[in-house]
Curated annotation (Swiss-Prot):
It catalyses: L-threonylcarbamoyladenylate + adenosine(37) in tRNA = N(6)-L-threonylcarbamoyladenosine(37) in tRNA + AMP + H(+). Required for the formation of a threonylcarbamoyl group on adenosine at position 37 (t(6)A37) in tRNAs that read codons beginning with adenine. Is involved in the transfer of the threonylcarbamoyl moiety of threonylcarbamoyl-AMP (TC-AMP) to the N6 group of A37, together with TsaE and TsaB. TsaD likely plays a direct catalytic role in this reaction. It holds the Pfam family TsaD. Keywords: Acyltransferase, Cytoplasm, Iron, Metal-binding, Transferase, tRNA processing. SUPFAM superfamilies: Actin-like ATPase domain. It comes from Streptococcus mutans serotype c (strain ATCC 700610 / UA159). GO terms for molecular function: iron ion binding; N(6)-L-threonylcarbamoyladenine synthase activity. Its main location: cytoplasm. GO terms for cellular component: cytoplasm. Substrate binds at L136, V137, S138, G139, G140, D169, G182, D186, N275. PANTHER family: TRNA N6-ADENOSINE THREONYLCARBAMOYLTRANSFERASE, TRNA N6-ADENOSINE THREONYLCARBAMOYLTRANSFERASE, MITOCHONDRIAL. InterPro entries: ATPase_NBD, Gcp-like_dom, KAE1/TsaD, TsaD. This is tRNA N6-adenosine threonylcarbamoyltransferase. One of its GO terms (biological process) is tRNA threonylcarbamoyladenosine modification.
Length: 336
Protein backbone atom coordinates (compact mmCIF):
# COMPACT_ATOMS: atom_id res chain seq x y z
CA UNK A 1 0.00 0.00 0.00
CA UNK A 2 1.29 3.44 -0.94
CA UNK A 3 1.06 5.93 1.90
CA UNK A 4 -1.24 8.90 1.36
CA UNK A 5 -0.37 12.35 2.67
CA UNK A 6 -2.87 15.23 2.81
CA UNK A 7 -1.82 18.80 3.53
CA UNK A 8 -4.73 20.68 5.11
CA UNK A 9 -5.18 24.43 5.58
CA UNK A 10 -7.57 26.13 8.03
CA UNK A 11 -8.08 29.92 8.14
CA UNK A 12 -11.81 30.41 8.73
CA UNK A 13 -11.49 32.77 11.70
CA UNK A 14 -8.53 33.80 13.86
CA UNK A 15 -6.24 30.76 13.72
CA UNK A 16 -3.91 30.08 10.81
CA UNK A 17 -3.24 26.36 10.77
CA UNK A 18 -1.61 23.80 8.48
CA UNK A 19 -1.48 20.05 9.11
CA UNK A 20 -0.22 16.87 7.48
CA UNK A 21 -2.24 13.65 7.78
CA UNK A 22 -0.76 10.30 6.79
CA UNK A 23 -3.39 7.84 5.56
CA UNK A 24 -6.58 7.98 7.68
CA UNK A 25 -5.31 8.46 11.19
CA UNK A 26 -1.69 9.55 11.58
CA UNK A 27 -1.49 13.29 12.23
CA UNK A 28 2.17 14.06 11.56
CA UNK A 29 1.99 17.80 12.18
CA UNK A 30 -0.58 20.42 13.15
CA UNK A 31 0.88 23.93 13.13
CA UNK A 32 -1.35 26.61 14.69
CA UNK A 33 -0.59 30.33 14.64
CA UNK A 34 -3.11 31.92 17.00
CA UNK A 35 -4.20 35.55 16.82
CA UNK A 36 -5.93 35.67 20.22
CA UNK A 37 -3.55 38.28 21.63
CA UNK A 38 -4.21 40.59 18.67
CA UNK A 39 -7.98 40.48 19.16
CA UNK A 40 -8.17 40.63 22.97
CA UNK A 41 -8.17 44.42 23.16
CA UNK A 42 -11.14 44.55 20.79
CA UNK A 43 -13.18 42.05 22.81
CA UNK A 44 -13.72 39.87 19.74
CA UNK A 45 -12.37 38.98 16.31
CA UNK A 46 -11.85 41.88 13.90
CA UNK A 47 -12.18 40.41 10.37
CA UNK A 48 -9.69 42.74 8.68
CA UNK A 49 -7.07 42.13 11.37
CA UNK A 50 -7.62 38.38 11.08
CA UNK A 51 -7.13 38.41 7.32
CA UNK A 52 -3.90 40.41 7.55
CA UNK A 53 -2.45 38.01 10.13
CA UNK A 54 -3.30 35.02 7.92
CA UNK A 55 -1.42 36.62 5.01
CA UNK A 56 1.63 37.22 7.21
CA UNK A 57 2.04 33.68 8.55
CA UNK A 58 0.42 31.16 6.21
CA UNK A 59 3.50 30.46 4.06
CA UNK A 60 5.63 29.86 7.15
CA UNK A 61 2.94 27.56 8.57
CA UNK A 62 3.03 25.45 5.40
CA UNK A 63 6.81 25.19 5.59
CA UNK A 64 6.73 24.27 9.29
CA UNK A 65 4.03 21.63 8.77
CA UNK A 66 6.05 19.89 6.05
CA UNK A 67 9.25 20.10 8.07
CA UNK A 68 7.67 18.72 11.24
CA UNK A 69 6.06 15.89 9.27
CA UNK A 70 9.42 15.04 7.71
CA UNK A 71 8.12 15.09 4.13
CA UNK A 72 8.31 17.31 1.05
CA UNK A 73 5.68 18.62 -1.33
CA UNK A 74 6.57 15.77 -3.66
CA UNK A 75 5.27 13.23 -1.13
CA UNK A 76 1.80 14.77 -0.93
CA UNK A 77 -1.33 13.20 -2.41
CA UNK A 78 -3.72 16.16 -2.07
CA UNK A 79 -4.30 19.60 -0.59
CA UNK A 80 -7.38 20.26 1.55
CA UNK A 81 -8.79 23.62 2.59
CA UNK A 82 -11.67 25.03 4.60
CA UNK A 83 -13.99 26.88 2.20
CA UNK A 84 -16.72 27.72 4.72
CA UNK A 85 -18.35 28.64 6.97
CA UNK A 86 -16.30 31.51 8.37
CA UNK A 87 -15.12 35.06 7.77
CA UNK A 88 -14.96 35.60 4.02
CA UNK A 89 -11.65 37.48 4.03
CA UNK A 90 -10.01 34.93 6.29
CA UNK A 91 -11.30 32.02 4.20
CA UNK A 92 -10.01 33.58 0.98
CA UNK A 93 -6.45 33.80 2.33
CA UNK A 94 -6.35 30.09 3.13
CA UNK A 95 -8.02 29.18 -0.14
CA UNK A 96 -5.61 31.28 -2.19
CA UNK A 97 -2.67 29.57 -0.51
CA UNK A 98 -4.19 26.10 -0.96
CA UNK A 99 -5.04 26.65 -4.62
CA UNK A 100 -1.62 28.07 -5.43
CA UNK A 101 0.12 25.20 -3.65
CA UNK A 102 -2.08 22.59 -5.33
CA UNK A 103 -1.53 24.14 -8.78
CA UNK A 104 2.23 24.47 -8.34
CA UNK A 105 2.59 20.87 -7.20
CA UNK A 106 -0.01 19.29 -9.52
CA UNK A 107 -2.16 18.08 -6.61
CA UNK A 108 -5.94 17.66 -6.34
CA UNK A 109 -7.83 20.14 -4.15
CA UNK A 110 -10.27 18.92 -1.50
CA UNK A 111 -12.93 21.40 -0.24
CA UNK A 112 -13.84 20.87 3.43
CA UNK A 113 -16.73 22.19 5.52
CA UNK A 114 -15.28 23.70 8.71
CA UNK A 115 -17.97 22.07 10.88
CA UNK A 116 -17.34 18.67 9.28
CA UNK A 117 -13.76 19.18 10.40
CA UNK A 118 -14.83 19.73 14.01
CA UNK A 119 -16.94 16.59 13.87
CA UNK A 120 -14.27 14.41 12.27
CA UNK A 121 -11.65 15.48 14.81
CA UNK A 122 -13.20 12.69 16.90
CA UNK A 123 -11.63 10.23 14.47
CA UNK A 124 -8.28 11.06 16.08
CA UNK A 125 -9.11 9.04 19.20
CA UNK A 126 -11.67 6.48 18.02
CA UNK A 127 -12.65 4.56 14.93
CA UNK A 128 -16.08 6.13 14.56
CA UNK A 129 -19.04 3.78 14.22
CA UNK A 130 -21.94 4.83 11.98
CA UNK A 131 -24.63 5.98 12.13
CA UNK A 132 -23.74 8.50 14.82
CA UNK A 133 -25.08 11.72 16.30
CA UNK A 134 -22.94 14.80 16.87
CA UNK A 135 -23.45 17.88 19.01
CA UNK A 136 -21.35 20.66 17.49
CA UNK A 137 -20.82 23.58 19.85
CA UNK A 138 -18.60 26.53 18.95
CA UNK A 139 -18.44 30.30 18.81
CA UNK A 140 -20.50 30.41 15.63
CA UNK A 141 -22.56 27.23 15.67
CA UNK A 142 -24.74 25.03 17.84
CA UNK A 143 -25.97 22.05 15.83
CA UNK A 144 -27.15 18.50 16.23
CA UNK A 145 -25.98 16.51 13.22
CA UNK A 146 -26.99 12.99 12.20
CA UNK A 147 -24.23 11.20 10.30
CA UNK A 148 -25.56 8.11 8.53
CA UNK A 149 -22.21 7.27 6.95
CA UNK A 150 -18.80 8.93 6.56
CA UNK A 151 -19.32 12.27 4.82
CA UNK A 152 -23.14 12.06 4.99
CA UNK A 153 -24.04 14.96 7.32
CA UNK A 154 -27.57 16.11 8.07
CA UNK A 155 -28.56 18.83 10.54
CA UNK A 156 -31.49 17.71 12.69
CA UNK A 157 -31.42 20.61 15.15
CA UNK A 158 -29.71 23.98 15.49
CA UNK A 159 -29.86 27.31 17.32
CA UNK A 160 -32.46 29.87 16.33
CA UNK A 161 -30.27 32.76 17.43
CA UNK A 162 -26.96 32.89 19.30
CA UNK A 163 -24.47 30.04 19.23
CA UNK A 164 -23.48 28.79 22.66
CA UNK A 165 -19.88 29.99 22.33
CA UNK A 166 -21.11 33.41 21.25
CA UNK A 167 -23.27 33.61 24.39
CA UNK A 168 -20.24 32.78 26.56
CA UNK A 169 -18.17 35.54 24.99
CA UNK A 170 -20.95 38.12 25.27
CA UNK A 171 -21.65 37.53 28.96
CA UNK A 172 -17.90 37.39 29.55
CA UNK A 173 -17.58 40.86 28.04
CA UNK A 174 -20.32 42.14 30.36
CA UNK A 175 -18.39 40.82 33.36
CA UNK A 176 -15.15 42.36 32.13
CA UNK A 177 -13.46 39.04 31.42
CA UNK A 178 -10.76 38.66 28.79
CA UNK A 179 -11.76 37.47 25.31
CA UNK A 180 -12.28 34.61 24.64
CA UNK A 181 -14.15 34.14 27.91
CA UNK A 182 -15.31 30.52 27.74
CA UNK A 183 -12.44 28.95 29.66
CA UNK A 184 -12.50 31.56 32.44
CA UNK A 185 -16.29 31.30 32.84
CA UNK A 186 -15.94 27.52 33.13
CA UNK A 187 -13.26 27.89 35.81
CA UNK A 188 -15.27 30.46 37.78
CA UNK A 189 -18.40 28.31 37.49
CA UNK A 190 -16.64 25.48 39.32
CA UNK A 191 -16.03 27.85 42.25
CA UNK A 192 -19.59 29.18 42.50
CA UNK A 193 -23.17 28.11 43.18
CA UNK A 194 -26.17 27.98 40.85
CA UNK A 195 -28.26 30.55 42.74
CA UNK A 196 -29.73 32.66 39.93
CA UNK A 197 -32.78 31.38 38.09
CA UNK A 198 -31.85 31.94 34.46
CA UNK A 199 -34.24 30.77 31.71
CA UNK A 200 -33.82 27.47 29.87
CA UNK A 201 -35.44 28.39 26.57
CA UNK A 202 -37.32 25.80 24.52
CA UNK A 203 -36.39 22.79 26.65
CA UNK A 204 -40.06 21.82 27.01
CA UNK A 205 -40.79 22.16 23.30
CA UNK A 206 -40.98 19.01 21.21
CA UNK A 207 -38.18 19.89 18.79
CA UNK A 208 -34.40 19.80 18.59
CA UNK A 209 -33.82 23.53 18.27
CA UNK A 210 -31.82 25.69 20.67
CA UNK A 211 -32.09 29.30 21.82
CA UNK A 212 -29.57 31.20 23.91
CA UNK A 213 -30.57 34.84 23.30
CA UNK A 214 -33.06 34.89 26.18
CA UNK A 215 -30.50 33.46 28.58
CA UNK A 216 -27.93 36.00 27.43
CA UNK A 217 -30.40 38.88 27.84
CA UNK A 218 -31.47 37.70 31.30
CA UNK A 219 -27.83 37.57 32.39
CA UNK A 220 -27.07 41.04 31.02
CA UNK A 221 -30.20 42.52 32.66
CA UNK A 222 -29.37 40.98 36.04
CA UNK A 223 -25.82 42.30 35.89
CA UNK A 224 -26.91 45.76 34.71
CA UNK A 225 -29.66 46.12 37.34
CA UNK A 226 -27.29 45.10 40.13
CA UNK A 227 -24.76 47.72 39.03
CA UNK A 228 -27.48 50.38 38.89
CA UNK A 229 -28.42 49.56 42.48
CA UNK A 230 -24.84 49.35 43.67
CA UNK A 231 -25.20 45.65 44.51
CA UNK A 232 -22.23 43.31 44.44
CA UNK A 233 -22.63 40.04 42.55
CA UNK A 234 -20.13 37.21 42.91
CA UNK A 235 -18.74 36.40 39.49
CA UNK A 236 -18.38 32.77 40.55
CA UNK A 237 -22.11 32.46 41.25
CA UNK A 238 -23.04 34.32 38.06
CA UNK A 239 -20.87 31.98 36.01
CA UNK A 240 -22.13 28.87 37.81
CA UNK A 241 -25.74 29.88 37.20
CA UNK A 242 -25.14 30.79 33.56
CA UNK A 243 -23.25 27.60 32.82
CA UNK A 244 -25.85 25.44 34.59
CA UNK A 245 -28.54 26.90 32.32
CA UNK A 246 -26.44 26.34 29.19
CA UNK A 247 -25.68 22.74 30.11
CA UNK A 248 -29.31 22.00 30.95
CA UNK A 249 -30.35 23.19 27.49
CA UNK A 250 -27.64 21.20 25.74
CA UNK A 251 -28.36 18.02 27.69
CA UNK A 252 -32.14 18.12 27.24
CA UNK A 253 -31.89 18.63 23.48
CA UNK A 254 -29.16 16.03 23.06
CA UNK A 255 -31.20 13.43 24.94
CA UNK A 256 -34.22 14.19 22.75
CA UNK A 257 -32.07 13.75 19.67
CA UNK A 258 -30.73 10.42 20.92
CA UNK A 259 -34.30 9.25 21.48
CA UNK A 260 -35.30 10.28 17.96
CA UNK A 261 -32.16 8.93 16.29
CA UNK A 262 -30.99 5.74 18.03
CA UNK A 263 -27.24 5.47 17.58
CA UNK A 264 -24.36 3.86 19.42
CA UNK A 265 -21.99 6.83 19.24
CA UNK A 266 -22.38 10.47 20.30
CA UNK A 267 -19.67 12.92 19.22
CA UNK A 268 -19.25 16.24 21.03
CA UNK A 269 -17.06 18.65 19.08
CA UNK A 270 -16.22 22.31 18.52
CA UNK A 271 -14.45 24.84 20.70
CA UNK A 272 -17.00 24.56 23.52
CA UNK A 273 -16.30 20.80 23.70
CA UNK A 274 -13.22 21.82 25.72
CA UNK A 275 -15.55 23.01 28.51
CA UNK A 276 -14.92 20.86 31.61
CA UNK A 277 -18.42 21.43 32.95
CA UNK A 278 -19.88 20.04 29.72
CA UNK A 279 -17.62 17.01 29.88
CA UNK A 280 -18.65 16.34 33.48
CA UNK A 281 -22.37 16.61 32.67
CA UNK A 282 -21.99 14.22 29.76
CA UNK A 283 -20.51 11.60 32.09
CA UNK A 284 -23.40 12.11 34.52
CA UNK A 285 -26.30 12.31 32.06
CA UNK A 286 -25.44 10.20 29.01
CA UNK A 287 -25.40 6.48 29.75
CA UNK A 288 -25.28 3.31 27.64
CA UNK A 289 -23.78 5.07 24.64
CA UNK A 290 -20.23 5.69 23.47
CA UNK A 291 -19.43 9.40 23.91
CA UNK A 292 -16.44 10.57 21.88
CA UNK A 293 -14.86 13.99 22.47
CA UNK A 294 -11.73 15.11 20.60
CA UNK A 295 -8.65 15.90 22.70
CA UNK A 296 -8.38 19.50 23.87
CA UNK A 297 -5.73 20.31 21.23
CA UNK A 298 -8.25 19.44 18.48
CA UNK A 299 -11.32 21.17 19.95
CA UNK A 300 -10.47 24.68 18.80
CA UNK A 301 -9.93 25.63 15.16
CA UNK A 302 -7.02 23.68 13.65
CA UNK A 303 -6.04 22.12 10.34
CA UNK A 304 -5.69 18.65 11.83
CA UNK A 305 -9.46 18.32 12.02
CA UNK A 306 -9.74 19.55 8.42
CA UNK A 307 -7.34 16.81 7.37
CA UNK A 308 -9.45 14.11 9.05
CA UNK A 309 -12.55 15.35 7.22
CA UNK A 310 -10.58 15.60 3.99
CA UNK A 311 -9.56 11.94 4.24
CA UNK A 312 -13.25 11.01 3.98
CA UNK A 313 -13.76 13.25 0.94
CA UNK A 314 -10.61 11.85 -0.69
CA UNK A 315 -12.00 8.32 -0.46
CA UNK A 316 -15.25 9.53 -2.03
CA UNK A 317 -13.39 11.29 -4.84
CA UNK A 318 -14.78 14.70 -3.88
CA UNK A 319 -12.35 17.19 -5.40
CA UNK A 320 -12.76 20.81 -6.46
CA UNK A 321 -11.58 22.88 -9.40
CA UNK A 322 -9.22 25.78 -8.83
CA UNK A 323 -12.09 28.25 -9.28
CA UNK A 324 -13.53 27.10 -5.93
CA UNK A 325 -14.93 30.09 -4.03
CA UNK A 326 -15.38 30.77 -0.33
CA UNK A 327 -18.81 30.16 1.18
CA UNK A 328 -18.94 32.10 4.47
CA UNK A 329 -22.47 30.86 5.25
CA UNK A 330 -21.86 27.25 4.20
CA UNK A 331 -24.06 24.74 6.02
CA UNK A 332 -24.73 21.05 6.02
CA UNK A 333 -27.85 19.86 4.19
CA UNK A 334 -30.07 21.65 6.72
CA UNK A 335 -33.09 20.94 8.85
CA UNK A 336 -35.46 18.19 7.83
Amino acid sequence: MIDRYILAIESSCDETSVAILKNEDQLLSNIIASQVESHKRFGGVVPEVASRHHVEVITLCIQDALQEAGITAGDLSAVAVTYGPGLVGALLVGMAAAKAFAWANHLPLIPVNHMAGHLMAAQSIADLQYPLLALLVSGGHTELVYVAAPGDYRIVGETRDDAVGEAYDKVGRVMGLTYPAGKEIDQLAHQGQDIYDFPRAMIKEDNLEFSFSGLKSAFINLHHNARQKGEQLRLEDLCASFQAAVLDILMVKTKKALAAYPVKTLVIAGGVAANQGLRERLKEDIKDINVVIPPLRLCGDNAGMIAYAAAVEYEKGHFAELDLNAKPSLAFEGLE
